[in-house]
Amino acid sequence: MFRNIFSIAGFLIALPLLAQTQNLPVSWVDKDTGHRVIRLTDEPGSSGFYFNVNAFTPDGKQMVYTAPDGIHALDLASQKTRLVVPNPPRPADAGSDPRAYFRFGVHTIVVGRKTNSVFFTKFDPDAKQSVIYKADVYTGEVTKLVALPPRASVATINADETLGVGTYDENETPPEQEYGRNRPAPASATGATPGAQAGNLVQPEGKGEMMERRLAARIPVVLYTIDLKTGKMTTLLHSTDWIGHMLFSPVDPTLLMYCHEGPWQKVDRIWMIHTDGTHNILIHKRNMAMEIAGHEFWGLDGQTIWYDWQYPKGEDFFLAGYNLQTHKRTAYHMQRNEWSIHFNLTQGETLFTGDGGDPGQVAKAPDGEWIELFHPQMLNVMEGAINDSDFWQPGVFHSEHLVNMAHHNYRLEPNVRFSPDKKMVIFTSNMFGHSYVFGVEVSKADNLAASDVHSTPELASQFNPTSPTPTH
């Protein structure tokens, strides 16, 4: 319910900061990789969506992102941006607490799969309830859909844009039990500062302890659907597990993926259920102590669920896929330095990408701070080799560095995604201090002038002299 509150550390942008933004570099070629990096947004505190949440319009021409002043759209061809849904004025009674201001802002859910709409919620201070809206990304026209009951949130919209899914606590929850509700706003070092809605992008201080506390609380929750026309709510399940990361299939409007939150080694995380409440299925069942699986996402064709699989935790690394039609399982192996917090892929699954991680992440990678491009290769099964129909099919990633992220503070997760034309990997970074959305071209740059080539960490340090400290 409070997943977006983590991104707030302020609520006003100073004019000198805006002036400084105009001097930030817009484009350069990374000296260490040979790939061109482009800063796509101008707003300090701007941020892309969480890695597995759709940000692109169905026509593939627009990408939605958030900034302190509201919801924006980026034209992918011209790289021009515009404000689509502004944040409302700060309420007079909001006080000095940035959380109070944040509560009344607009909060994105997802970009629709059927229409060029971005779905979002906004709190109605008069009715004292959250309301779901959608806005046309091109015209900005806003349509009010349905109101939510107390304690309820919506996390995803289905493929035909008829249903939302979310959770609510069955009882009022003490603040000390709800994950993140009583924690301080994050330090500005993350870059997710002036009111930007980064949501799951920011790794909070004390995250592990808070997750343990929330899991142990066993708070009764309801997973539900809500009809976006009538407001009718349908219960899918009651649970005292910590339910989160709901994500509808990109093609099947009746199919929902969700997870049991908590320390990964303590939960069976990845689940699938239908909108009639049937076929509640665990996607990955462990068979080793300390085996973990998580950060799940859909393939763009809706046939495969992909996820980070470590066998065991922090020692051996795979990107695993489960095909819902064939029930076949694929595992692409990677090296420690290639592991990433999040992964993503192209249509057709010909290329994958990852956002790397600093030495404080689970992989403890000594040289993992890169935006990576992965070329997948399935391994040949030798003639005569035993290959049961239930066996994992093995593959390997061949990695290519795209961006040197050594000056990025990984407490803000980059959350990579490919552009629809597969020509660019898009990510969020605070390398310049405040967060911005960047792109890096998949193809290497050519015909370069020497003045165009820079070390990304050295360039970033000119504008942000503070060196990042590893997460832990």
Residue ranges and their predicted role:
Residues 20-38, 212-224, 386-392:
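Blade/loop signatures of beta-propeller domains
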Residues 28-48, 395-405:
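A short helix->beta-strand "capping" segment at the edge of beta-propeller domains
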Residues 70-73, 127-133, 173-180, 213, ...:
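Structural motif
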Residues 46-64, 89-121, 149-169, 238-259, ...:
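Conserved beta-propeller blade repeats
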Residues 90-222, 231-238:
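Asp-box/WD-like beta-propeller blade repeats and closely related beta-sheet repeat scaffolds
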Residues 412-472:
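Blade-level signature of beta-propeller repeat domains, shared across WD40, Kelch, NHL, RCC1
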Residues 76-79, 136-140, 227-231, 274-278, ...:
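Short loop/turn segments that connect beta-strands within beta-propeller blades
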Residues 305-308, 312-317, 333-397:
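Loop/turn-rich, solvent-exposed surfaces of beta-rich toroidal or solenoidal domains
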